[in-house]
Amino acid sequence: MKETPKKVLVIGSGPIKIAEAAEFDYSGSQALKALKEEGIETVLVNSNVATVQTSKKFADKLYMLPVVWWAVEKVIEKERPDGIMIGFGGQTALNVSVDLHKKGVLQKYGVKVLGTQIDGIEKALSREKFRETMIENNLPVPPSLSARSEEEAIKNAKIVGYPVMVRVSFNLGGRGSMVAWTEEDLKKNIRRALSQSYIGEVLIEKYLYHWIELEYEVMRDKKGNSSVIACIENLDPMGVHTGESTVVAPCQTLDNLEYQNMRTYTIEVARSINLIGECNVQFALNPRGYEYYIIETNPRMSRSSALASKATGYPLAYVSAKLALGYELHEVINKVSGRTCACFEPSLDYIVTKIPRWDLSKFENVDQSLATEMMSVGEVMSIGRSFEESLQKAVRMLDIGEPGVVGGKIYEAKMSKVEALKYLKERRPYWFLYVAKAFKEGATIDEVYEVTGISKFFLNKIKGLVDFYETLKILKEIDEETLKLAKKLGFSDEQISKALNKSTQYVRKIRDQSNIIPVVKLIDTLAGEWPSVTNYMYLTYNGTEDDLEFSQGNKLLIVGAGGFRIGVSVEFDWSVVSLMEAASKYFDEVAVLNYNPETVSTDWDIARKLYFDEINVERVLDLIKKEKFRYVATFSGGQIGNSIAKELEENGVRLLGTSGSSVDIAENREKFSKLLDKLGISQPNWVSATSLEEIKKFVNEVGFPVLVRPSYVLSGSSMKIAYSEEELYEYVRRATEISPKYPVVISKYIENAIEAEVDGVSDGNRVLGITLEHVEEAGVHSGDATMSIPFRKLSENSVNKMRENVLSLARELNIKGPFNVQFVVKDNTPHIIELNLRASRSMPFSSKAKGINLINEAMKAIFNGLDFSEDYYEPPSKYWAVKSPQFSWSQLRGTYPFLGPEMKSTGEAASFGVTFYDALLKSWLSSIPNRIPNKNGIALVYGDKNLDYLKDTAVNLVKFGLTVYSISELPLQGIETIDKTKAEELVRAKKVETVVTDGYLKKFDYNIRRTAVDYNIPVILNGRLGYEVSKAFLDYDSLTFFEISEYGGGI
C-alpha cells in the first residue's frame, strides 16, 4: 500500500428497486469490513433502513439521508473524509459520485476517489465513450452510433440498419432500452429512452438476434495484475436483459478457444478503463461461428459480481475494497479458502444456476414479455453436480408452486404444443417450464430452438428430464437404481410421488430404507485441489460421502428468506443476520439455510455454517438427520419459514419460539377471526367464503365496499377492495386460485380509517411493543404505506386499547419471539386486521428508530423472559423517524400505477428528523425519482378520493411557487383546470414537475400516470401523503443532516 486514508466515505445504493437490490448490502458490508481491518474510520451514507450495513457495527458514522449529491455534500462538509468509495452502491452511487466530481465538491474538500477513477467510470458508462474506447484499443464492438436527440437516433438507426438495439447511458436495469424492428418502433419509444439516461444519451446498436450472451468477472489491481474470477453463461439469448436471464456458471457450451479469447478481451477491457477493483464484461457470441463482440462493462460491484462471488466462493467485494486501498492481488488473502491469495482464479466442481423471480401478476397492464428492461424483483441460486440437478433445485427455490422443471401445474395443464410454443415465442417468465411442456406435447429440439434461440445443449438436457419423468409415470413401483437416478437428476420426493401416484412419505421411506440420502459438499473456490478451511456448503445426490464431520452439541438451524419478491426483501435478511448474532449466545453452533446470492446472510464470514440450498420440508429434514439440530428457527425469514412451520412440527421438529399451531391460527384468516371473537377483540365484520350464497348474504348485511383476503399469503397477494358485485366475484375467483387449500375471508372495508401497527416481541406473558402510524389511510397495503414513529394522529386512548389487544393475543397464543399486529382505527376504536407471528417487514425500521434491536430482544424473551416489570413496555422516542416506499413503476412496462391493499413497492427508505416534516421529506426524497420540484414549474393535482387533502395539496404547491392545474373532468374547488388532453401534452413535453393524484382511475388517466413514470416525473398516488409532502416542501430550507446517533436512533 502506498497510503492509508484516515477516514473513508462509502456511498450506499439507497432503497431497493428493480435492478438495484440487496447485492449492494452484501458488497457495501464487505467494503466496510475491509476498511475497518485497516483501522480506517468509516462514514456511510445510505437511506435503506432495511439493510444490515445500516447498523452501527459496520460503519463508525451512519447518515440515513437521500443518496443525492447535495445531501452527500453536507456529509462531506461535516465529516471531511480524505477518501471516497463509490463502487459498492450500484448505479446510484456512481451517478452521485460523478455529480460530486463535476460540481467540484470532491476537489473542494480534497476527497480522493479510491479505486477506479471518474474518467474510467465515464468511459464505461457513457455508451459513446465506451464505444470509442473499445475501438481505440482494437476491441470488437457491434456496429453502432450514439444519439442525444430523437432526430439523431432516427438518422443513426437508418445508418446502422434495422433491427436495432437502443442502449441507454448511465442507466439502471436497462430502463428505457428496447429493440426496434422498424422506424415506427423507434419513434414510439425513443423519447422515453432518452428520458431514462442520466446524461441524455443512447446508443443505436445493430441487434444481434439470437446470439449467445456471456459475462466475465475480472479483478485488477493498481499494477495491472488481473484475475478472471468467473465466466457466466446466459441461457436466454441477446435481447433479454441479463438480470432477466437464467444463467449458469461455469460456462457450459464454450470451447477452449472461445473461452480464452473472451478471457483475454475481458482483461483488455479492464485495462482500457484503468480499472482498480472489479468489473464485469458482457459479450455477444455468434452461435454459428467464432465471432464475438464486447457489449458493455460495469466498473463496480454488481448483481453479477454478487452472483459470481457466491457461485465461486471468491470474496469479490472484500478483495475489491482492498485493491481500492492500493493492495496488489498477491497481497490479499482469500478469506473463504483461508489458504490462497486473491490472484488464484477459482475452479468449480459443481454447476450453479441462477433464475430470476418475477411478481408481474401484481401489476395491471404490465407487459409480460422478457426483453431489454429488467422487471424481476429477486433471484435464486442453486448448486448441483449436474445441470439437471442444479436447474430443478433452482425451480423449486423460486417458490412459485412448481416442484421442478416437470410434474407441476404448467406441465400438467391443458395446453397444446402450439400454445406452449406461442408462450415461448412471447418470452414469458419461467420459459423452461413451457419448454418442458412443449416437449411433453411432442415439440422437437429444432422447433423449440427456432422460437427461443436457447442453446440446443440446454434444450437436450430439459428434454431428457421430460423423457425420464414420462418413464416414471408408467411404473407401478420404483426400484433403488431408478430412485437413485431420479435424485441425481434433481427430482424431489414430491415430483417422484406424483409420477408414481404415491405419497411423499412412501418415497421418503424407500429412500431411508435404501440409504439414498444427499451428501454435503464444500465450496472452497479450489474444487478440493488445495487444502482449505470453509463453512460454505450445499447438498447433492451426485456424490458418495460428506466433505466434513458433523459436530455434536446444542445446535440451531435458521431458515432464511429465500429469493426476494414483492413483500420479501432485504428487511428479512436483516432479521436473519440479527438472529444469527443473537442466537450465538445461546447455542454451541448456529447454521443458516438460504439460497439468495444477493444477501449478507449468504456471505462467507457471517454464519458459522452456511447451507446454500433449498428451503422446504424435505431439505430441512435431510439436514436435521445429518446435523441433529436441536431447534429450527422459521420466524426470521418472512413467509417462507412460516409456511413450512406446521409441517415441520408435525414431523417432530422443535421450532424455536412460537409454536407451529399458533402460527397456523394466525395465518388462517378464519381461525384467527374466531380467536378474536373469543377474546372480545374488535375486528371488521367478516365471513368465510365457502359459497356464493353466503357471500351475497354477508354483503347485503354490511354493504360495499368489502375486502377479499386469501390465507397464507404475503404482501397482500390477491387482496382486493370490491365496490360492486362484479368486482367481488372476480376477486374471489382470483383469491381461490392463489390459495386454493384455504378458505377466503370477506370482510367489511372500513373507509377513512387510520392504519397503525405494533412491532413487538413477547415472552408469552409480557410485551415489548413499538407503535407505527401510517400517513395514508387504511386500504393502502402496509408495505406501500409511509410510516411514522412516534404516532401522530392516534389518540392515547386508542393506542392504549391497541396495547391491551396485543397483550391479550400474546398471552392467549403464548407468543414467544417477534410478531407484528396491524390495526385500523375508526372513531378511536382499534380493529385488528392481521397478526404475523414472525419478524416483520417494518422491524428494521422500528428497531433503528427506537435504538433497540427487536430480534435481540426476541431471543431474550424466548430463553430468559423480558427484563422489565411492566406488562407492556414501549421505548420512548427522542426524535422523529419516517419510512417511505420505493416503487419501480418505470421498470414495469405498461403497468398502471395505483395503490391498494395488494403490495406494489420493491423497497423502502427511511430518515430521521427533529420534526415529522424534516424526517418525512428526507425519507420521501430518498426514493427515486422523487425530487424537490423546480419553482415556476407545473404540478398536476386531481383525483376522486381524499378531495379535501388534494385541494390543500394544491394550495401548498402554489405557496411553494408552482403553477398548479387540476383536470376539468375531476375539478378541485378554487384550482385552475385544464382538460385531460392538455394535461397529457404537458407531461409528454416534460413540463410537469410533479403529479399528485388519488383513486383508481385507469380508464381516465392511464396515459398521464404511465407517461409520468416513464419520463421520471415524481408521482404521489395518495392525497393524504401529497398534502404532507407538499407541506414539507414549504420547510425545505430547515432540513437537518445529522448522524443517526444525534437523533437517538440506530442499533
Curated annotation (Swiss-Prot):
Requisite cofactors: Mg(2+); Mn(2+)
Stated name of the protein: Carbamoyl phosphate synthase large chain
GO terms under biological process: 'de novo' UMP biosynthetic process; glutamine metabolic process; L-arginine biosynthetic process
Amino-acid positions noted as binding Mg(2+) 1 in the UniProt annotation, renumbered to this chain: 282, 296
Span list, region Carbamoyl phosphate synthetic domain: 549-930
Keywords recorded for this protein, A-Z: Amino-acid biosynthesis, Arginine biosynthesis, ATP-binding, Ligase, Magnesium, Manganese, Metal-binding, Nucleotide-binding, Pyrimidine biosynthesis, Repeat
Annotated positions binding ATP 1: 127, 167, 173-174, 206, 208, 213, 239-241, 282, 296
PANTHER family in UniProt: CARBAMOYL-PHOSPHATE SYNTHASE [AMMONIA], MITOCHONDRIAL, CARBAMOYLTRANSFERASE FAMILY MEMBER
Protein residues bound to Mn(2+) 4: 834, 836
Binding of Mg(2+) 3, residues: 822, 834
Natural source organism: Saccharolobus islandicus (strain Y.N.15.51 / Yellowstone #2) (Sulfolobus islandicus)
Annotated positions binding ATP 2: 709, 748, 750, 755, 779-782, 822, 834
Stretch list, region Allosteric domain: 931-1051
Free-text comment on this protein's domains from its UniProt entry: The large subunit is composed of 2 ATP-grasp domains that are involved in binding the 2 ATP molecules needed for carbamoyl phosphate synthesis. The N-terminal ATP-grasp domain (referred to as the carboxyphosphate synthetic component) catalyzes the ATP-dependent phosphorylation of hydrogencarbonate to carboxyphosphate and the subsequent nucleophilic attack by ammonia to form a carbamate intermediate.
Family statement drawn from the similarity comment of this UniProt entry: Belongs to the CarB family.
Transmembrane segments annotated in the record for this chain: none
Molecular function as annotated in GO: ATP binding; carbamoyl-phosphate synthase (ammonia) activity; carbamoyl-phosphate synthase (glutamine-hydrolyzing) activity; metal ion binding
Binding locations of Mg(2+) 4: 834, 836
Function of the protein: Large subunit of the glutamine-dependent carbamoyl phosphate synthetase (CPSase). CPSase catalyzes the formation of carbamoyl phosphate from the ammonia moiety of glutamine, carbonate, and phosphate donated by ATP, constituting the first step of 2 biosynthetic pathways, one leading to arginine and/or urea and the other to pyrimidine nucleotides.
Binding site for Mn(2+) 3: 822, 834
Region (Carboxyphosphate synthetic domain): 1-399
Assembly with partners or alone: Composed of two chains; the small (or glutamine) chain promotes the hydrolysis of glutamine to ammonia, which is used by the large (or ammonia) chain to synthesize carbamoyl phosphate. Tetramer of heterodimers (alpha,beta)4.
EC number: 6.3.4.16, 6.3.5.5
